[in-house]
Amino acid sequence: MSYPNQMNGSMYGYGANNGVQPGFDSYGMPINQGGMNYQQQTYPYQQPYQPDGYAGNTMLPFQQSQPATQFNNGFGYASQPTGSVADYGQQQQQMYGYNGMMPQTMNNTGFMQPQQTGAIPGFAPQPTGFVQPQPTGFMSQQPASFMQPQRTGGAGFIQPQRTGAMPAYQPQMNNFMQPQKTGGFAPQATGFMQTQPFGAAPSFAPQPTGFVQPQQTGVVMPPQPTGYLQAQPTGPFASFVQPQQTASFMPAAQPLKPQKTGQIHNSKAMDTRLSFVSAADQAKFEQLFKSAVGREEAMSSEIGKAILVRSKLPTVQLSKIWRLSDTTRSGRLLFPQFVLAMYLCNLGLTGKPIPDKVPDGILNEVNAMVDAISFSLDENYAKPTQPIPQAAAQQMAAQMFGGFQQAAGIPSQITGFQPQAMMPQRTGMQPQMTGFQQPMIPQRTGMQPQMTGFQQPMMPQRTGLQPQMTGFQQPMVPQRTGMQPQMTGFQQPMMPQRTGLQPQMTGFQQPMVPQRTGMQPMMPGLQQPMAPQRTGMQPMMPQRTGMQPQMTGFQQPMAPQRTGMQPMMPQRTGMQPQMPGMQQPMAPQRTGMQPMMPQRTGMQQPMAPQRTGMQPMMPQRTGMQPQMPGMQQPMAPQRTGMQPMMPQRTGMQPQMPGMQQPMAPQRTGMQPMAPQRTGMQPMMPQRTGMQPQMPGMQQPMAPQRTGMQPMMPQRTGMQPQMPGMQQPMAPQRTGMQPMAPQRTGMQPQMTGGPMLPQRTGGMAPQPTGMPGQWGFINTPLSNLPGIEALGQQMMPNAPSGGLNNTFQQKKDIPWAISKEEKRIYDQIFDAWDKERKGTLGGNAVLEIFGQSKLTRTELEHIWNLCDHGDKGSLDRDEFAVALHLIYRKLNGNEVPAVLPPELIPPSTRNFTESLNQVKNLIKNDTSNRKPFGAENQSKLKKNSFYDNPSETTEKDATLYRHNDSDASAYVSSARRRDFKEEKIESAPPIINDIDSEIASLKKRIHEKSLVVNALEDKKLAATPANDVQNDSLIYRIKSVQDEINRLSTSNKSPEVASMNVRLEELSTRVSKMLSDINEVDHTIASLSLKLFQAEDTKNSYDQTSPEATQERNRTISSKLAEMEKQKNESKAALEQMKNYVTNIENNIRAKLLPSAANDDAWLSQNVVDESVTRVVKELPVPAPAAPQTLNPPSVSTVQQSKPIESNTHTPEVKATSESPSASSNLEDRAARIKAEAQRRMNERLAALGIKPRQKGTPSPAPVNSATSTPVAAPTAQQIQPGKQASAVSSNVPAVSASISTPPAVVPTVQHPQPTKQIPTAAVKDPSTTSTSFNTAPIPQQAPLENQFSKMSLEPPVRPAVPTSPKPQIPDSSNVHAPPPPVQPMNAMPSHNAVNARPSAPERRDSFGSVSSGSNVSSIEDETSTMPLKASQPTNPGAPSNHAPQVVPPAPMHAVAPVQPKAPGMVTNAPAPSSAPAPPAPVSQLPPAVPNVPVPSMIPSVAQQPPSSVAPATAPSSTLPPSQSSFAHVPSPAPPAPQHPSAAALSSAPADNSMPHRSSPYAPQEPVQKPQAINNIAPATNLGTSQSFSPRMGPVNNSGSPLAMNAAGQPSLAVPAVPSAPSNHFNPFAKMQPPAPSPLQPSGHDSDNWSQHGDEEEEDSEDDIRSSKDAAALAAKLFGGMAPAHPVSTPPVRPQSAAPPQMSAPTPPPPPMSVPPPPSAPPMPAGPPSAPPPPLPASSAPSVPNPGDRSALLQQIHTGTRLKKTVTTDKSKPIAGRVLDASDGNSSAWYGNLS
């Protein structure tokens, strides 16, 4: 170990003898002094003191700081706490300065500088209570601190002397002495080795001589009694002995008892030498151990932990070290165990691994020493009175381990006094203390003189100190205190300090330097070794040991310091008494330091390695080869390697002559050899030859022939070197001529260099083994070409590639499988045998062998050879054989027909043999045995020749008694059993056998059961333990998994962690939001339900109570009256309309007679479908009808306003306000209407697949003119389908179709939509401004629209357009009432309509008014007040309330605007029912959003605006046929301006966003046979087959299916809410192509699921054929549909036109699943309408006002069936067949209303 200290001569830098001087033991004590066995060495953990003592601490690591008792010395100065040496700052310098290692600047002649009691220059700071200003003290630092240093010299030594622990004296600051720390001994703590560095003297400077300015020598020195030194157990650890603190702390402690301060432990076992640590380390460990445990023999776990922790090793390693060290598992460490722990810690600190188990040798040694200690202990050995604090143990250990890390013993000073506590001094002076111990006691008195010098007791010394005192004072000269001389000593004058301190004085100043030791003699020797000063007291002799600590400070070198005490003798100054005590002993001490100086080199031990500098060469002997590399030049001496060779540096001095000059260089022999080296490296084995000589071999070796006789035969040994020797060597071959001939001898050895020729590697290919040694042939891979490639190719997942390229030439491969081959084959087998079955099946083998690319035949043959026993699989050996055969084949060898013996696997071979043997035994043994044959001879002894064998045979147990001669081999008796021949007598033996077998089986069963029970018991017994173990394992697994998870998460970056946290937060928020949404949904649902219940309170009261009955009766009566009134009004209006229509028709006929004739002829030619013809013929002769103004909010209007589903966009033509004068131009209008009707008829026919006779091109007519056109005609057509048919025949159908809204009906432009729609309603009347089918009719046409467009039930026939395939309308659209009509581009609601949309609350009222009143009133309004309506904003999208016009399912986009016809006119005739128009694509259908709220389910067939027809058509295609008749395809005629509510309703459908509100009243069952629809001009439905709008039933304005009134008639419950968008209620409001009619989709069965497929098939069958007569049809159609009161009276809640339920038997409830909608709120008043003709009493009871819940209740009671009152309107549209010609009853209109 190298030490940072310069003094590395000894273990810690104090000489080769570890600082022990002759005549002194290791502790510096005279050998004859027993009991003073102080430890020599300083604590390995000690480090230089900090200015205030130990590094970072004020006390020794293991000392508890005792309160520094401040002594009030006689001078009245508070004594400084002991140990607080003021000037420890210089102690560091003094640390190792003793041997001059440290600067001698302060050659504190004071007692051993460590003791600094000598003239420690630091005394200056140590004002020993003397006048501190007297820095005259040593070094100016000693600010006149009186002779403070002297104090140490004389009295100074007194407390400081305590052990040199004069520092302790410092605490005694007898106010003067205290500062006197000059004893500096505080620094002297070196006694504790801290300051021991004699060089520490400088520190004395800081040691203000405890003399405070008051320098009162009178300070009672008694406190100084070095007796405190007792506490200073000299033991190095005694330094920790708290008692030492007494130097300053303990009041004049009793003189140290003869305590063996040096050796606390009496156990001799402690002296046992442990081999695994060095002696020095063991000594250090012993010191540490003793200082830690005090007087105890074992170290507690707490202190052990404190010490171990300071090593800063990981906790895991410390735990392991403790476990390994505590061999007795007692929780305490004895000394050997502690050494073992320190040893292990040292391993850890040096980076070496700590073994898991202590090596047996070390363990045995430790255990032996532990046992010895255990046996040697006294049962009552002293226990430590005060345990060492754990913190102290940690500090001490830190210093220890710090020393390890520094590779130098930590300065023993570490234990130095804690600054005030002088405690360190204890250790330093402990020896002295012992010296002062009993001997010191006198010293006390010795000090007393000093004290008297300082105090009266010092009197004698006083003089000694007085000079100092004066010296400390500026007038140090007077030195009154007896220190005066010293003072001069501190100053130059101090030198004369005769006063016994004189030397010290000089010591205090440079002159004092000698005085340092307090002994002038020491000063010369000391100058470093002030150690003698220690002995400032005769008792100090024992203190020598006290110096040992100093020595430890110096470590062993301190021993000489002991002798340093001899100089103390000169310390006569103040110490004269002590000096005598010190003299003899001190004398040697003085010299102690001189020797130390050389020891400083400490190289002696290190030199040992140097000595071995050649040792490494030892191995070089061998041929010098090692030397050659390392030596090269150095090798020249080669002494190493062969001491004898050293002379032979040349390697062959004798040979040198023979070497010729060249050999001289050979001296370097190695240099040339260097190349040879390489040659020789192979020679390494040849060491035996020339090993030593090799370097110098060359010729000189010749005589030596390798220096070894054995080499002589190896003479050739050099020949190989010759190649390496450079050419010159060649001649030298061996440097010996004799070797020359031998050179051949080396040829074999050429392996060294020329071994290359000896490539005997050829031997490798020669396989070994015998043919039978399967798998043991040792053939090198070099002889097996391609085997590696084969192995790689056969591995799983190997890239496919042929092996043929690897095997290109034929090579003879031995039959036997070599070891390498077998290894490769086994690897392949293991790679494929994933399940470790031990066999590979055919599939795997096929895949493997297939890699070889051999033919299938060859592989089959190989398989057959290898698959022994035909198992279908190959085991490991068989697989190897197969691969070997493949390998041979790849190398060009043929596959043998039979496996050679070498290839027969042992397992197979042996198995076969065994099997054969067993077979033979089975076959032959039992049948051929002859029990009584020769082999069955008796083995009994024959006792007599006369014995009769026959007599003994029966008793002979050696004979086989059973005779099997008759027995044959086993033959199954079941083969040819002949039951007949079986004899009964054979049974008993069988039974017996069976019984015996049963008994044996029972026995076996019993035995097995016992075994099973035993196993169960064992298992049960083991179960708890297993469970516990399993639980613990599971717990461990979980904990490990948790740890893994934790580590994996902890290793993640903060970003990931934050993101995870964020994700969790978001997830939590999402889940919370979802739950909140669910709660809100539930809340909404519950509130909606409560709202509905609140609104429906009338339905909730007890229906059976008298009050309820009375209420119902009153309601029914009132409604019946209203219905009667409405019926009458409707009838009147109908009659008026009829007349009006008739007049118009007549006019038209008159003007268009030729065309009409042609039409009739055309119809008669069967060109038109029969049903169409019937309808046309049934149309009544047009009669002029009195124009009646009808309120626009008629259902027909609303439905007309619904956009036609056609995608063709027609610009919305706004009906300009038309004055009544517009009607004057009836002829023009009639012509235009006719043209439009003809066009529509052609479109219808085209849609039905009938080629129209001619396509009526709408004659262009100005919008105004169109609007001015009399609306009556369409109205009549709407009212009278039959008439419409007739009108059609005379081209009137076009007129009637267009009448509903003449100008607007004809959309000017049809914007093509993606799907080609039937141009129904697309045909533009040139006379009218083009309006989109979906757009509201031109306001100008509003008057007509009010009357006709709303009244017309069927749009005029449209030219048939190729029907697009029926779009697969989603069930949702089918299920729900008209989906929110996505307003098609062509179905733009008029702005008026949009603006007029009623608010939601108003919607119902409007529905009520519209549905109830608008049916007839709208007709009347339209007829009577067409001009007025024209001025009103028409709801272009509002379908006619009356005419849910069934439009052929032609593409919605192509649907031509269907002009509503007069309510009385049936305009359906133009539309042949046979061919349904192609349904619009689903995409074009508005989602099946309930466009109509409950009130929207107005049973009236709403007539849709031209554009709305097509949309209705497409959706209707999915409706059941019955419903299709009511499809809400509005007539293309633009609706007349509706009442705002109606307009709103009509426009509502345009609002696609409005969700479909399924109304509990929405009809849900398709109306198979529509009955008279109130005020709905059935013309559309009549005129069009159900296929036109297969999906739509009768629809109200809102687009919802027409709610059937109680009478079963569809009631026109058109919500007329002014502002709310009616999208939810009136899908026909704008007839958006995609919007399914609000009617329950025809495609829904009773469960509202798709039936439209079937129903569409029936569309054509259910088409409107014809009605019996127009009047009857109109009566039935409008009888129940007439508004309860004229639409013109919006305030009144319109009631269903149907008569009260009581008035007539209620027809079966309409098939709608939802009851008719409650009456809507009254519609806004509109133009007064002619009272509708009274409805026939026989008609079904009118549906109560849709907006009235009581009406709804009445409807329910009358039979109207509520199917589902749900938010989603799944009600089926009331879609009966328009005209069910099959039954020939006009009641077919009601379809399935019942």
From Swiss-Prot:
Ranges annotated as biased composition (Polar residues): 1188-1225, 1326-1350, 1571-1600, 1783-1794
Keywords: Actin-binding, Cell membrane, Coiled coil, Cytoplasm, Cytoskeleton, Endocytosis, Endosome, Membrane, Phosphoprotein, Repeat
Name this protein carries in UniProt: Actin cytoskeleton-regulatory complex protein pan1
Positions carrying Phosphoserine: 1219, 1221, 1406, 1409, 1412, 1414
Disulphide bridges: none
Region (Disordered): 651-674, 717-747, 925-956, 1183-1227, 1249-1287, 1303-1794
Pfam families xref list: DUF1720, EH, WH2
CDD domains: EH (cd00052)
Subcellular location field: Cell membrane; Endosome membrane; Cytoplasm, Cytoskeleton, Actin patch
UniProt feature, compositional bias: Pro residues: 1356-1368, 1705-1736
A molecular function GO annotation: calcium ion binding
Predominant cellular place of this UniProt entry's protein: membrane
Domain EH per the UniProt entry, residue ranges: 281-369, 821-910
InterPro entries: DUF1720, EF-hand-dom_pair, EF_hand_dom, EH_dom, WH2_dom
Coiled coil location: 1107-1151
Segments forming domain EF-hand: 313-348, 854-889
Domain WH2 positions: 1748-1765
GO cellular component: actin cortical patch; cell cortex; cytoplasm; endosome membrane; nucleus; plasma membrane
Domain of life: Eukaryota
Entry's family note: Belongs to the PAN1 family.
Free-text function comment from the UniProt entry: Component of the PAN1 actin cytoskeleton-regulatory complex required for the internalization of endosomes during actin-coupled endocytosis. The complex links the site of endocytosis to the cell membrane-associated actin cytoskeleton. Mediates uptake of external molecules and vacuolar degradation of plasma membrane proteins. Plays a role in the proper organization of the cell membrane-associated actin cytoskeleton and promotes its destabilization.
Topological category with respect to the lipid bilayer: Peripheral membrane protein
Residue spans of biased composition, Low complexity class: 651-666, 717-732, 1265-1276, 1407-1418, 1499-1530, 1539-1553, 1610-1622, 1694-1704, 1737-1746
